[in-house]
Amino acid sequence: KTQVFLTPKGDHYRTRLSHTLEVSQNARTIAKALRLNEDLVEAIALGHDIGHTPFGHAGEFVLNGLCENGFRHNEQSVRIVEKLEKDGKGLNLTWEVRDGILNHQSRLMPHTLEGKIVRFSDKIAYINHDIDDAIRALVLTEDDIPLELRKTLGFSTKQRLNTLIHNIIMNSREKDDIMMSPEIEEA
C-alpha cells in the first residue's frame, strides 16, 4: 500500500495487507454498531484491493496505458475472485461480496449497506494512514494540518479515526443508507 513512501524504513508504514486489515476492522466496527452483517463486510473488505498491481499507483498507471480499456484495480479484483483463483474456477463468492468489491471505488455505489460501509472504511483507512505515515516520515507534523480540520476531525490519528467511525454510525442509525454528516464528509 505504501503509495507515498516507496522505500520505507522501520515497521510502522502501512502496506497493502495492513491497509486491508484496517479497512476490515473499521468496517466490522461500523457493521456491528448498526447491527448489519459483519461477515459480509469482512469478506468485501478482505477482497477489495486484491486486484492492485505491484508498485502501487505507478504500476496501475503503466497497466492503464497498456490495457485496451484501461486498468482499474476494482475490476481486476472481481476478475481474480471470479476467474483466476482456484485454477480458473473462482471463489464462488456471493453477488453481494462481488458487488461490494467492484463498487468500493467506482462511479457506482455498492447495492448493499455492507458494501457502502466498506467504501467509507476504505476512505477512512487510506486518508488517516497516509497522514499518519507522512507524520512518521517527518514529511509533515500534526500542526501542518489546518486547525479547522483538526478541530473538526481530531488532533491525532486515533481521534480522527474515532470521529469518522462514530459519525458514520450516528448518521446511519435507523436509516436505509450509510452516510456521514455533511460537515465531516466535507472535511
Task: List each model region and its residues.
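Histidine-centered, transition-metal-coordinating active-site segments
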Residues: 1-16, 20, 24-30, 35-38, ...
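Acidic, glycine-rich active-site loops and adjacent beta-strand->loop/helix elements
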Residues: 46-50, 105
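Post-HEXXH active-site segment of zinc metalloproteases
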Residues: 39, 43, 56-71, 136-138
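Short active-site segment of divalent metal-dependent hydrolases/proteases
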Residues: 51-55, 125
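Short alpha-helix carrying the canonical HExxH Zn2+-binding catalytic motif
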Residues: 42-47, 120
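A short acidic, glycine/proline-enriched capping/turn motif at secondary-structure boundaries
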Residues: 28-30, 49-52
